[in-house]
Amino acid sequence: MTATPYPILLTPGPLTTSDRTRAAMLRDWGSWDTDFNAITARIRQQVLAIVHGDDTHECVPLQGSGTFSVEAAIGTLVPRDGHVLVPVNGAYCQRIAKICKTLGRRLSTIDYAEDRPMRAADIDRQLAADSTITHVAVVHCETGTGVLNPLDEIAQVVARHGRGLIVDAMSSFGAIDIDARTTPFDAVIAASGKCLEGVPGMGFVIARRTALERCEGNSHSLSLDLYDQWKYMERTTQWRFTPPTHVVAALDQALQQYVEEGGLPARGARYASNCQLLVDGMETLGLKPYLERKVQAPIIVTFHAPADPRYDFKTFYQAVKQRGYILYPGKLTEIETFRVGCIGHFGDAGIPGAVKAIGEVLAGMGVEIGMTVAA
């Protein structure tokens, strides 16, 4: 069992937060008050600093889940007659493609197996062959499996062709380096409840200022219009519509702790250590990771489910939960898996404790350890 009265979330967000972050939500804020506006301004500056984008980019926060911000970025930055190339190697890439279709943006895709990263050379060939493509939209860390895509290589290719790059960095931002000075992008999109260890409820788009300035009138939506949101914030320091005040206050506190910890290098190192402990521990149980280690992001790890017919995910999940850990089901199309997150605010005993609980549960179910689905 865990030492806390509530389960540890071993998920890619929402995730386990610190007492300080939760305590920040105990105060109520006026959404038009100058003190709250100062919090918003501070968050915008701190988020920009993480990517070294102060001189070239703008941080535009938005209410809602991260997907709201992804849709806002595509709907605002891609003109209505634009053409988006989406490399697809997982569920969240597929979501971007669905957004493009829903918004009526022309779409092309490059399809990969779910256990393989995107290849910059494929994108290079596609851009060379089709001059109508205006933007490329990629997922940095595909949360469906945990595969890490080669963002910098892709960014250099897209820039060389003079196209815009939109990056869904939901599961990587704040833990895996993205540097606006060396990795060209029009937008990087992330959210409060992931690697920054805030709570869910707001996202943000880090948009290249020169790209954003050209976007007036592009958006299909009033509430998801990033250009209007940005201009209004610049003019008034306020959100256009009622902000999630408690979520904003929690993110402000989470960012303070992020800096205290040592910023991106320290956060990334902690998650990498968690990932290593997790994979090593699960392999001792005979549970095989779905991905090769060289393409595994230290955010969430997908494991093959046991092939033993006595294994049932719902029973397994509930029993692990009773021991204090909440896992994630798989999000693959062909193979039965389950996922374990490496991110969140939990102590050094968190991952070893989870591995121990998983081993006990499988043994209690009579599942033959090591009898897993073949790759």
UniProtKB/Swiss-Prot annotation:
It is an enzyme of class 2 (transferase). GO terms for biological process: organic phosphonate catabolic process. It comes from the Bacteria. Pfam families: Aminotran_5. Keywords: Aminotransferase, Pyridoxal phosphate, Pyruvate, Transferase. It catalyses: (2-aminoethyl)phosphonate + pyruvate = phosphonoacetaldehyde + L-alanine. The modification N6-(pyridoxal phosphate)lysine is found at residue 194. SUPFAM superfamilies: PLP-dependent transferases. Its EC number is 2.6.1.37. GO terms for molecular function: 2-aminoethylphosphonate-pyruvate transaminase activity. The keyword Chaperone does not apply. InterPro entries: Aminotrans_V_dom, NH2EtPonate_pyrv_transaminase, PyrdxlP-dep_Trfase, PyrdxlP-dep_Trfase_major, PyrdxlP-dep_Trfase_small, SP_NH2Trfase/AEP_transaminase. Its cofactor is pyridoxal 5'-phosphate. Involved in phosphonate degradation. Belongs to the class-V pyridoxal-phosphate-dependent aminotransferase family. PhnW subfamily. Homodimer. This is 2-aminoethylphosphonate--pyruvate transaminase 2. It comes from Cupriavidus pinatubonensis (strain JMP 134 / LMG 1197). The lineage of its organism: Bacteria, Pseudomonadati, Pseudomonadota, Betaproteobacteria, Burkholderiales.
